[in-house]
Curated annotation (Swiss-Prot):
Its main location: secreted. Keywords: Cell outer membrane, Cell wall, Membrane, Secreted, Signal, Transmembrane, Transmembrane beta strand. GO terms for cellular component: cell outer membrane; extracellular region. This is Probable outer membrane protein pmp9. Residues 635-928 form the Autotransporter domain. It comes from Chlamydia pneumoniae. Belongs to the PMP outer membrane protein family. SUPFAM superfamilies: Autotransporter. It is a peripheral membrane protein.
Length: 928
């Protein structure tokens, strides 16, 4: 079936039996292959005739072709396709070419024996060669005496092919794999070199648009997946991986890739600009678990990982991940992503008594060196496994860590990390798992060099350019034969322990250790000072400088006081003091840091502002209940009845620099009854239950169950209208005036969960309760023209006072338990507004719109005192401060189905400077 994914346009020619087409203008032979050339054994398969055209042979696919089980039960006596004189080309034109279970005896499936000629495959939607060789005598799936090219095919798969010589899948004087979106080499095998690819020339793998994978390929000698003796390039691939490839023979090297030559010039293996690059689980005998090469240039274009690769030897395994040959060179540049070495090992000894040691890279003997070790800003090279070297005498070739490309250019500003943090406890007890050696003078040109978790870095000498940073954990060591000059040393506060020190050590006679600038302290995690131990004075013997004579240790240009890199931090606040002691017996000077607490600045995770802000949630709820009752009384056409309403509230407060934003949502029901006390007095009682949620824009969530009760009294009076009011539409000389008074009580039970990032989830329970009082007066006017938009209007003014109380409580189920004292919210406001109403013709329905301006004339913002019980450190937790002015818009509808049954619905919105709230209700009333 023709693939729907066409990498090239399909030829318009019809599928024909095997035929020859000769061009009148060229001597190239073109042969069509179509579905009729497919074969499925067992049975007798006759391969196409061997071609011998000096100007080349092209096979054009006119449809999908599948050849399976050819050579069964009797092996073929020749290759399926063979050219002896010219180029041999296969052009897919968007079709599939599938070959599987081919037995060609000692022959390859595809062969070009012509010297300096090309064997190529291009334009296939799917090119697949699976088990296309004899399992014991086969010599590879594709073999070309000249170059081999696989280009511009949508998907290529080479699996389980075998060579009794070199190159289980491909062999050529050079190999190019380019512009293939999907490329897979799996479980190919060679009894000599190159389990998947073999070339004495260069190999290029580039522009793989999706992924390229080399997995479980095996060679006996060198290059479990790839063997080459010339400079080769693996570049600009979206993702490429080498997983579980291996070599098996004694002294075999390069578990995944071998790129080396005995003759000059020595080849360079270049891995550059790959969006993702992985070497995982590859194994070599002797050297280079993943890569063995003379010269390696690795420049990351994305995340690059060397993990769990290993070199195994009874005597001296070298390079768990990478082995650089004698006189070779290494360049590592983390430019487009991090480069990480983790879990790579060398395994030494007989199988019954093997020892495993962490190792990332081994630099060979005879002047082998590192020429570049650098990372761009925002990128890091992680050495969780040490670097070793076979060189016994240090080189004079300097290595500029993060050095520029050219003299005069700016230095790189990324980070280079040597760390033991990925070691198990047993591994960390072995010094060789922590010690990296670079037998060259080191200069830190820019960015940061970080020594973490007990590692030791050994070099010929070490110096530091201005603007760069050396970060050391307590317990790490920088050791040189020659001198050490440091102008910006930073210690990790989180690593300080009474028995561990950072060490700067010069081992040869008359060499100096010079420390200048400031000794700085940094908290990389941002959480160190939250530990309760900082509540007490602390003394740390943190740094030792060692030389052959204390006189060669220079600290005269070092600032007297340490410098905190992040003086504004969460947790305990305090001051650091630095002192020095000289020890002539150990020929060293030791630094001591003393900590004195001065205060506490709580982490935003512990401030608990949502607790105080739940008072605003209760405030919103009780005020919405009061508004519902007042609206219900005004909309009622009769004076006696029972009613029920569903109610919902939504309140949102934006974040500010001081307070996290939060939101409150609640919904429930209100039931009430209205009756008359006297001819001019109306009384309403209501009960409400609400279910609410509160959450801040952080780590706190609260659930609340609220109960409320309200009592509303309305009195109608008639007053003589002031002369000014008589000019208003609908005014009369005797003006009716409504006086309303309402009091409400609310009780809310809260259950809050705090999802700490560094501690177990905390849980809290408490209650809020409070009351609200409302006094209002309105002037109903009903004589507007019935031709207008509204028929009546009601100007009004109110005074509202609310008091909400939060009970004290203690947190539970977490490590650093907090307590919260009680807190209060008081708010007094004066709303002024007007309601417009329109009636239906039969007055069974009405519609109303209300606009209100609210001024909060007095407020006590919610706050409470919060404390950590473990040390009784406390701080003030404040709730948000709403804008003192608000605008409210409200719309409502009333409909009477009968004299005894009414339905009402209202929607309102309140806008403040940095908050907004919405309220909706729907219900009915039964009158009697």
């Amino acid at each position: 079936m023709k693939s729907s994914l066409h990498w090239f346009l399909i030829s318009s020619s019809l599928a024909l039996p095997l035929s020859l087409n000769f061009s009148a203008f060229a001597a190239v032979v073109e042969i069509n292959l179509g579905p009729t050339n497919s074969f499925s054994g067992p049975g007798t398969y006759t391969p196409p005739a061997q071609t011998t055209n000096a100007d080349g042979t092209i096979y054009n696919l006119t449809g999908d072709v599948s050849i399976t089980n050819a050579g069964s039960p009797t092996a073929l006596t020749a290759s399926c396709f063979k050219e002896t004189t010219g180029n041999l080309s296969f052009q897919g034109h968007g079709y599939q070419f599938l070959l599987q279970n081919i037995d060609a005896g000692a022959n390859c499936t595809f062969t070009n024996t012509a010297a300096n000629k090309l064997l190529s495959f291009s334009g296939f939607s799917y090119l697949s060669l699976i088990q296309t060789t004899n399992a014991t005598t086969g010599t590879g799936a594709i073999k070309s005496t000249g170059a081999c090219s696989i280009q511009s095919n949508y998907s290529c798969y080479f699996g389980q092919n075998f060579s009794n010589d070199n190159g289980g899948a491909l062999q050529g004087s050079s190999i190019s794999l380019s512009l293939n979106p999907n490329l897979t080499f799996a479980k190919n095998k060679a009894t000599q070199k190159g389990g998947a690819l073999y070339s004495t020339g260069g190999i290029t793998i580039n522009n793989t648009l999706n992924s390229a994978s080399f997995s479980e390929n095996t060679a006996a000698n060198n290059g479990g997946a790839i063997y080459t003796e010339a400079s080769s390039f693996i570049s600009s691939n979206k993702a490429i991986s080498f997983i579980n490839n291996s070599v098996t023979a004694t002294s075999a090297t390069g578990g995944a890739i071998y790129c080396s030559s005995t003759s000059a010039p020595k080849p360079v293996l270049t891995l550059s600009d790959n969006g993702e690059l992985n070497f995982i689980g590859n194994t070599a005998i002797t050297s280079g678990g993943a890569i063995y090469t003379d010269n390696l240039v690795l420049s990351s274009g994305g995340p690059t990982l060397f993990k769990n690769n290993s070199a195994i030897d009874t005597a001296a395994p070298l390079g768990g991940a990478i082995a650089i040959a004698d006189s070779g060179s290494l360049s590592l540049s983390a430019l487009g992503g991090d480069i990480t070495f983790e879990g790579n090992t060398v395994v030494k000894g007989a199988s019954s008594s093997q020892t495993t040691t962490r190792n990332s890279i081994n630099i060979g003997n005879t002047n082998a060196k590192i020429v570049q070790l650098r990372a761009s800003q925002g990128n890091t090279i992680y050495f969780y496994d040490p670097i070793t070297t076979s060189i016994t005498a240090a080189l004079s070739d300097a290595l500029n860590l993060n050095g520029p490309d050219l003299a005069g250019n700016p230095a790189y500003q990324g980070t280079i990390v040597f760390s033991g943090e990925k070691l198990s406890e047993a591994e960390a007890a072995e010094a060789d798992n922590l010690k990296s050696t670079i037998q060259q003078p080191l200069t830190l040109a820019g960015g940061q060099l970080s020594l973490k978790s007990g590692v030791t870095l050994v070099a010929k000498s070490f110096s530091q350019s201005p603007g760069s940073t050396l970060l050391m954990d307590a317990g790490t060591t920088l050791e040189t034969a020659d001198g050490i000059t440091i102008n910006n040393l930073v210690l990790n506060v989180d690593s300080l322990k009474e028995t561990k020190k950072a060490t700067l050590k010069a081992t040869q006679a008359s060499q100096t250790v010079t420390l200048s600038g400031s000794l700085s302290l940094v908290d990389p995690s941002g959480n160190v000072y939250e530990d309760v131990s900082w509540n007490n004075p602390q003394v740390f013997s943190c740094l030792t400088l060692t030389a052959d004579d204390p006189a060669n240790i220079h600290i005269t240009d070092l600032a007297a006081d340490p410098l905190e890199k992040n003086p504004i931090h969460w947790g305990y606040q305090g001051n650091w003091a630095l002192s020095w002691q000289e020890d002539t017996a150990t020929k060293s000077k030791a630094a001591t840091l003393t900590w004195t607490k001065t205060g506490y600045n709580p982490n935003p995770e512990r401030r608990g502002t949502l607790v105080a802000n739940t008072l605003w949630g209760s405030f919103v709820d009780v005020r919405s209940i009061q508004q519902l009752v007042a609206t219900k009384v005004r909309q009622s056409q009769e004076t006696r009845g029972i009613w029920c309403e569903g109610i919902s509230n939504f309140f949102h407060k934006d974040s500010t620099k001081i307070n996290k934003g939060f939101r409150h949502i609640s919904a429930g029901y209100v039931v009430g009854a209205t009756t008359t006390l006297a001819s001019d007095n109306l009384i309403t009682a209501a009960f409400c239950q609400l279910f609410g949620k509160d959450r801040d824009h952080f780590i706190n969530k609260n659930r609340a169950s609220a109960y409320a009760a309200s009592l509303h009294l309305q009195h109608l009076a008639t007053l003589s209208s002031p002369s000014l009011l008589r000019y208003l539409p609908g005014s009369e000389s005797e003006q009716p005036v409504l006086f309303d008074a309402q009091i409400s009580y609310i009780y809310s039970k809260n259950t809050m969960k705090t999802y700490y990032t560094q501690a177990p989830k905390g849980e809290s329970s408490w209650y809020n309760d409070g009351c609200a009082l409302e006094l209002a007066s309105s002037l109903p006017h009903t004589a507007l023209s019935h031709e207008g938009l509204f028929h009546a209007y009601f100007p009004f003014i109110k005074v509202e006072a609310s008091y909400i109380h939060q009970d004290s409580f203690k947190e539970r189920n977490t490590t650093l338990v907090r307590s919260f004292d009680s807190g209060d919210l008081i708010n007094v406001s004066v709303p002024i507004g007007i309601t417009f109403e329109r009636f239906s013709r039969n007055e069974r329905a009405s519609y109303e719109a209300t606009v209100i301006y609210v001024a909060d004339v007095y407020r006590k913002n919610p706050d409470c005192t919060t404390a950590l019980l473990i040390n009784n450190t406390s701080w003030k937790t404040t709730g948000t401060n709403l804008s003192r002015q608000a605008g409210i818009g409200r719309a409502g509808i009333f409909y009477a189905f009968s004299p005894n049954l009414e339905v009402t619905s209202n929607l309102s919105m309140e806008i403040r400077g940095s908050s907004r709230s919405y309220n909706a209700d729907l219900g009915g009333k039964f009158q009697f």
